Every structure is written in structure tokens, then in C-alpha cells.
């Protein structure tokens, strides 16, 4: 199995390095990751400037000023030959649950892999300690995919409790929960008296009941949520069409 491995925490982050070491026990792994932390970069792509890369002695590649999406795009289309069989993103330092997936560079890297036609996993740890647990879970899933490919055409967003492996209760297939809208901005002043702004923490849990990714991780289970690239709200198409007909928009200007 050939794996393109990326993340949003940066090429030196403990999550990606722990996972790369574990995956190399049974797979051909190419790391292509940002040269610095790009958390929250979502699906952004660098279009107004060129991208430079740096290759370390162990073969890992850092994309200077690159986003997670840049890294996967370059990895698939230029840097990994032959091309990968699968794209894996992570292990992220901290969870990507509920609407976190909208902002997550970890999920975005996997989404770019899927958009380019490859199976893709996004892996996050609900904490900053037991990366070995998340690595073991990921390796188990990838070995299973080698034996029996999962033909859903979906991204698997995997969130792992920050627990020792022997305390993980199992796996639950889940849906994304939701958070309350975030509204905190933290102002500060620089030495010249100019106001600086920091984006505050995410909103608290809103929909975190049974069946959600939040609930699974809180209960000690690995959460696997299938995600897809198509953002169309299919169930709303008829509602929007009926509304347009009702208000006359499009029939007269």
C-alpha cells in the first residue's frame, strides 16, 4: 500500500511523525506536509504565489507556506511517484468533531485527496497525549482496507479518544454533531497602541446526543463519520424552487 500522508499541524508535529512511523511498518509512506502549523486553513489553495519544497534526510517533504490542500495536490500530482493508493491526514492535535470539519485543515487534506479520486482518511486525537492510540487505530483500519476495500466514495473522518489503547471501547459510525456559534474575539494592543484581534475558542456543544461524533468520543469510542465532497442540500432543492416560483424571482427583474 502506498500512502500519501499530510496534516495541518506541520511536518514536525508529533501526530504525523507518530503515524508515519507506525504506517512504515507495513506501507510505503510519503509525508508531504506544511512547514508550519496551518490549523484552520480549511480547503484554501495557494494561487497567487509559487510554492517551494524542502526534503528532509528521511524523505519527508515540507511545503513552505503551503496549506494542507496544497500539500495533497502537490503530493498527488508531482511529488509521489508512483501515485498513492490512499491519502491519510493526521494525526491532528485535538478533535475535529461536528462543525469543526468546516474549518479543519486535517479534514480538508483528506477532502482534497478524495476530490482527486483517492480514498481518504482524516484522523484526529481528542487531546494531545495518546498519539500511539490513534496511530494503532489508523493502522488497523488501513490493514482492513487493504484486505477489503470500502467502496463508498466517501472520506472517513476518524476521531479517537485521548486514552490508552486498552481503554478504547470500540468504534461507532456517527454523524456530525453541531456546536453553538462561536462569538468570542480577544482584543489586545501592540506596543504602538494598535488593536490586535485573536479569534476565540469554538462554540460549545449544541447537538451532541446519541449518534453524534461528540457522543461517541465522550463515551470512549472511536468515531467514524463518512463525509462527502458534494455540498448540495438535495432535500432543499424543491423548497427553493417552489419559493422562487411563489415570489416570481426569475420571471421578472
UniProtKB/Swiss-Prot annotation:
Family per record: Belongs to the SurE nucleotidase family.
EC number: 3.1.3.5, 3.1.3.6, 3.6.1.11
Keyword field: Cytoplasm, Hydrolase, Metal-binding, Nucleotide-binding
Chain positions recorded as a divalent metal cation binding sites: 8-9, 39, 92
Cofactor note text: Binds 1 divalent metal cation per subunit.
Cofactor(s) recorded in Swiss-Prot or TrEMBL: a divalent metal cation
NCBIfam families in alphabetical order: PRK00346.1-1, PRK00346.1-3, PRK00346.1-4, surE
One Gene Ontology MF term: exopolyphosphatase activity
HAMAP family, per database record: SurE
Protein's recorded name: 5'/3'-nucleotidase SurE
Reported function: Nucleotidase with a broad substrate specificity as it can dephosphorylate various ribo- and deoxyribonucleoside 5'-monophosphates and ribonucleoside 3'-monophosphates with highest affinity to 3'-AMP. Also hydrolyzes polyphosphate (exopolyphosphatase activity) with the preference for short-chain-length substrates (P20-25). Might be involved in the regulation of dNTP and NTP pools, and in the turnover of 3'-mononucleotides produced by numerous intracellular RNases (T1, T2, and F) during the degradation of various RNAs.
Gene Ontology CC: cytoplasm
Catalysed conversion reaction: a ribonucleoside 5'-phosphate + H2O = a ribonucleoside + phosphate; a ribonucleoside 3'-phosphate + H2O = a ribonucleoside + phosphate; [phosphate](n) + H2O = [phosphate](n-1) + phosphate + H(+)
Superkingdom of source: Bacteria
Amino acid at each position: 500500500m502506498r500512502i500519501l500522508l499530510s496534516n495541518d499541524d506541520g511536518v514536525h508535529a508529533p501526530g504525523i511523525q507518530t503515524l508515519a512511523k507506525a504506517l512504515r511498518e507495513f506501507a510505503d509512506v510519503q509525508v508531504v506536509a506544511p512547514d508550519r502549523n496551518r490549523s484552520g486553513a480549511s480547503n484554501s489553495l495557494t494561487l497567487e504565489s509559487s510554492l517551494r519544497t524542502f526534503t528532509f534526510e528521511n524523505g519527508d517533504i515540507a511545503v513552505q507556506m503551503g496549506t494542507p490542500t496544497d500539500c495533497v495536490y502537490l503530493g498527488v500530482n508531482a511529488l509521489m511517484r508512483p501515485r498513492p493508493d490512499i491519502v491519510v491526514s493526521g494525526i491532528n492535535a485535538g478533535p475535529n468533531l461536528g462543525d469543526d470539519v468546516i474549518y479543519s485543515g486535517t479534514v480538508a487534506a483528506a477532502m482534497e485527496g478524495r476530490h482527486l479520486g483517492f480514498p481518504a482518511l482524516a484522523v484526529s486525537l481528542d487531546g494531545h497525549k495518546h498519539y500511539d492510540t490513534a496511530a494503532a487505530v489508523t493502522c488497523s483500519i488501513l490493514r482492513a482496507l487493504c484486505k477489503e476495500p470500502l467502496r463508498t466514495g466517501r472520506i472517513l473522518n476518524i476521531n479517537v479518544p485521548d486514552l490508552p489503547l486498552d481503554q478504547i471501547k470500540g468504534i461507532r459510525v456517527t454523524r456530525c454533531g453541531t456546536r453553538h456559534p462561536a462569538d468570542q474575539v480577544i482584543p489586545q494592543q501592540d506596543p504602538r497602541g494598535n488593536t490586535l484581534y485573536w479569534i476565540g475558542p469554538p462554540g460549545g456543544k449544541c447537538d451532541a446526543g446519541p449518534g453524534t461524533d461528540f457522543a461517541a468520543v465522550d463515551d470512549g469510542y472511536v468515531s467514524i463519520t463518512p463525509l462527502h465532497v458534494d455540498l448540495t442540500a438535495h432535500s432543499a432543492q424543491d423548497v427553493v424552487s417552489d419559493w422562487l416560483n411563489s415570489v416570481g424571482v426569475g420571471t421578472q427583474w
